[in-house]
């Protein structure tokens, strides 16, 4: 058998594993969604679902292991397997797979992106930032390799916003400049993917970190976000965040009028807190 045929067979098998992986994750997501109330309230139900998920993923994991044993230099398979391992909360295993992929293919932007985001997630969960510099380096390189991938731009901006102080030390600029740098990266992501609500919402939220708070610019950003909202929940989130921006800008009456535009129940707890805080401000005696 020729090397070309061997490679073609490997790609076909890898595609089948990816399909099985995606199908399993889709099914598990459905299980969680359909049983959310029960697993939140009942520990036995939660444990039973966890066992069901483990059993569903076990054969997929074995397929990856068998494939990588026969094709250890297949970088894309290692990237995919690393992502798979995040679903079973095997953090170090995922990191090891992405680093192994980068040894084989140092220009694999997907591996660099995944590594950076995972290191950032671990830092947020553990409140330890020792891996953040590696995350910055990885996303810097991913963007260099593929500057037109909006996901990398968005992820980099989010990483900067989440770790302003470490980023300021790493890039040797002030935290305020880090936020401005992040907004620039969000701008790049939005230019590449202008209808992505998440990108626009995260950009608008970043203005909260600027001092003095640019109220007008923040409101304009949320208006642009609202214009591309496609679901009632997205619209409610944009209204809630617009109200928060008005609150920070001390535009109390605009807070109340904006909150009245919300129609769903999902964010009403936060809206209620903001409404009460605004009423307290309005009741304060004027100097």
Which residues fall in each region the model found?
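Terminal, low-structured helical/coil segments at or just beyond the last alpha-helical repeat
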Residues: 62, 233-287
